[in-house]
Amino acid sequence: MQACTLIARAKINLYLEILGSRPDGYSEVAMVLQSIHLADRLQLKSRPHGIHLTCDRPEVPTDARNLAYQAAELLQKECHSAAGVEIHIEKHIPVAAGLAGGSADAAAVLVGLNQLWGLGLTVGELQSLAARLGSDIPFCIQGGTQLATGRGEVLEPLADWEGIPVLLAKPKHLGVSTAWAYQAFRSRREILGATAPSEPALPTLPQALAALSRQDPPALARSLRNDLEQVVLPEYAIVGELRQALLSAGALGSLMSGSGPTVFGIMPSLELAAQARDTLRRQFQDVEFWVTQFAPTGILLQPDPCSLSPS
């Protein structure tokens, strides 16, 4: 194989609870991650040596700051490969949006180069390497619906729930740093401690898992939770405004994804999602909207099916 094309799907967080801090500086979390059909498209082509990365979005770095570039470097080092690769990223997932766009691209490079270079790594081996680059990348490799614990790299697949309509909303000129959001949450928890004002009762992980097991959209909507909203919403008022706007437009439930600023609404139907998108576009002219759906997988290798061995 000399070249391949991959579809790298975005993710949303249906549930994100921060349990505490870890000695390694990360946060201990419990999350439910869900792939959606909004996706980047990557083209990989063999070259004699070196890594050359291009992207159709000028704001995306094309050097070692890019996770996709780092993924190729990591495989070269760990597999003692002198082979090179040309990587082109066609971006559709917004940058710094809480949708794991960079992580999905890195996952696609790991999957694609495993095929292109004939490395024969299992999914489990790829996910172990992926965890060294970022906490969302192991999930992005397989995708679907999964419970993530630890710092997000310990995964437990849940029953796939395909086709649930989702409406995404992201302020065009706003990005939120994941590192800032987690640090702000830790600082808030340390400062407030036991004196923190009582919060309204938050959904729990068992409630979210029960809704998923029953495949009950209204119950899922009631169990949506993202602890990072506690620091992002006070800092960026537009995020809270968009959450409320999605609910007013008919969403069963609405939540910020990851560290934001993207918010999503679980919609009753694709038709209502499209109607809400058109209405909200007139109301929020500096916000991008996408209608999408839950997806059952993460990385899709085209045109041939992925031949990774299960771990």
Swiss-Prot record:
InterPro entries: GHMP_kinase_C_dom (IPR013750), GHMP_kinase_C_sf (IPR036554), GHMP_kinase_N_dom (IPR006204), IspE (IPR004424), Ribosomal_Su5_D2-typ_SF (IPR020568), Ribsml_uS5_D2-typ_fold_subgr (IPR014721)
Enzyme class: transferase
SUPFAM superfamilies reported in the protein's UniProt record: GHMP Kinase, C-terminal domain, Ribosomal protein S5 domain 2-like
Enzyme Commission (EC) number: 2.7.1.148
Pfam families documented for this protein: GHMP_kinases_C (PF08544), GHMP_kinases_N (PF00288)
Keywords, comma-separated and alphabetical: ATP-binding, Isoprene biosynthesis, Kinase, Nucleotide-binding, Transferase
GO process terms (BP): isopentenyl diphosphate biosynthetic process, methylerythritol 4-phosphate pathway; terpenoid biosynthetic process
Gene Ontology molecular function, alphabetical: 4-(cytidine 5'-diphospho)-2-C-methyl-D-erythritol kinase activity; ATP binding
Residues annotated as binding ATP: 94-104
Pathway entry: Isoprenoid biosynthesis; isopentenyl diphosphate biosynthesis via DXP pathway; isopentenyl diphosphate from 1-deoxy-D-xylulose 5-phosphate: step 3/6
Catalytic activities: 4-CDP-2-C-methyl-D-erythritol + ATP = 4-CDP-2-C-methyl-D-erythritol 2-phosphate + ADP + H(+)
Active site annotation, chain numbering: 11, 136
PANTHER family per record: 4-DIPHOSPHOCYTIDYL-2-C-METHYL-D-ERYTHRITOL KINASE, CHLOROPLASTIC (PTHR43527:SF2)
Function per UniProt: Catalyzes the phosphorylation of the position 2 hydroxy group of 4-diphosphocytidyl-2C-methyl-D-erythritol.
NCBIfam families: ispE
Family, as annotated: Belongs to the GHMP kinase family. IspE subfamily.
Protein name according to UniProt: 4-diphosphocytidyl-2-C-methyl-D-erythritol kinase
Source organism: Synechococcus sp. (strain JA-2-3B'a(2-13))
